Amino acid sequence: MEKPLDQRRFIWIIDDTDKIVHVNDAWLAFAGENTAPQLTANVVLDQPLCRFIQGQETRYLYQQIFSRVRAGVSPVKFPFRCDSPDCRRFMEMKLSLLSGNAVEFISHLLREEWREPLDLLDNSRDRSGEFLKVCSWCKRINIPGQGWGEIEDAIEPLDLFGHHTTPRMTHTICDSCHDAVKLELGLE
């Protein structure tokens, strides 16, 4: 029997200086359920959001999004992925302007695809000094000479099972996700 789709809304708010000032109970529960139990209210509140965003390109794009939302392009919606070792999670995020230049984030699950667990996505695994580029939005891996593909498609060409230690992942944004976000923001 298929598991019912999670209907919760995961909400967090940043103030005008981009510090996290609110996370709802659903957000905290989701973090605890999905390989990030360390993300408690005590850890995330009053911290700059950029502390929790990996990759220079991704941080820069979020800054562009915040600027556009604060300039009146609100709400902004875009799809993203929030995968775990055993599940692809397709989600949507909506950013809306609140009073005082605060920004509210509301994300929700669109669909899930369950799979065999992948060590590459297990945060508890030891990591080598090698790096794989992963898109922060769609979670595809950059496969040199082939472009961006699902993690399962990258296993053989990148010899991921041949490594004694799992490579580290460095976050960026692929061209198609970058173009989609820019289009949503009216930057094209």
Enumerate the language-model features and the residues they cover.
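PAS-family sensory modules
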Residues: 1-16, 45, 65-71, 97-188
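Sensory/regulatory domains in signal-transduction proteins
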Residues: 8-10, 14-121
